[in-house]
Structure formats: structure tokens, C-alpha cells
Amino acid sequence: MIDIIRELIKDKSVLILGYGREGRSSWQRIKEAGGYRQIAIADMNQVQTEEGHPARLICGPDYQKCLDDFDVVFKSPGIVLEKDIHDYRCEIVSQTELFFRRFGRQCIGITG
């Protein structure tokens, strides 16, 4: 998975949208992959990152206004976008989407 993330973020500006459980997990994998140009975290609530790993923090009610300032946005599943996903210029991805990029041929869906 790290190889897919590394390729996706290489030399790009990256935003983590939502800093709950999945956002923190994305932050760990992005740091592990490295190679990004800049990183930021956007969340409705005030957040902090651990020392030694600086990231620009965008917090408050307008936290979604910045999406098109970034090349790649890692969106947490609980975040409802303010606009249709196709109205953004940035590439918006999720952990689930990256999982299917990597393991899609090995997955079988079972319903009801």
C-alpha cells in the first residue's frame, strides 16, 4: 500500500480532510511514504499533530474551503463534501479507494 500512496503524493501538496481515527491513520501512512511537497490537515475541530512532524492546520467552520488549494485530498468517510466531488479540481481519495486500487482483483463482494 505504501507504494501506491508514495506514487500518488510524490511532489504534490496533500490535504488530510478530517482528523479522526482514519485521518490520523492516513497521516501515519503518508509520513511513512514521504515524498510529498507539503502537507496540511483540515478539520472542523481544533487539532494537533505530534511534535517533529509539522503540518499546516486548517480548522473551523470553513475547513472545506481550501480543498482546491491542494493536489491530493485524503477524505475521511464521515466528512460530507460541501460540493459534488466532480466540482473540485483536486484528486479526492479515501483509504477504501486505495485499498481497492491495490487489492481490487482479489476482492469478492457478498451481499444480503
PLM regions: where:
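Short, basic phosphate-binding NTP loop
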Residues: M1-T111
